[in-house]
Amino acid sequence: MEIKNITVAGGGVLGSQIALQSAYKGFSVTMWLRSEGSIERAKPKLERLRTIYKQTLEAMKTDPAAYCRGLITLTTDLQEAFGDTDLVIEAIAEIIDEKDAFYSSIRDILPQQTILCTNSSTLLPSAMMGFTGREDRFLALHFANNIWKNNTAEVMGTPKTSEESYEAVVEFARAIGMIALELK
């Protein structure tokens, strides 16, 4: 499966970094946020990250027009965020009931082929796979903070994750400049 359009759910520290890193590497990115207030809080985070990228990454210094091309759309609309996405990376609060409510809210909107990933660092994907309605296309993709320099991404499936979904996520992680740590 080819991943072109990604949606990052959550605009906190890691959600913002995942969105910008993905846009930096040329993916079309939508950030879904719960409220207009969340959108307003995410904008300065993204701008600060763009500044960091411009100051620290060689590729940005040599050809800044080729990177961070404004490919990030911020929205609170579920249909806009999830109706045409290939990959969802959920980076919301580490509260199991909130994750359940989130996955339940998008389940019927997602295209059939969409793969779902959690960025959770404290909850195993097997604890959440039942929330998704697509256990074969659900796994963890966990990033380290400051992903532009700590470029590792842990990829962890569940007993029900398909090999195709797992490999597509490993390929995506590599495509955005991560060293994919495959946890099986």
Residue ranges and their predicted role:
Residues 20-23, 107, 129, 170:
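A structural alpha-helix within SAM-dependent methyltransferase catalytic domains
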Residues 2-5, 69, 85, 113:
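Phosphate-coordination loops involved in phosphoryl transfer and adenosine-cofactor binding
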Residues 24-27, 83, 146-156:
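Acidic/polar active-site rim loop that often engages polyanionic ligands
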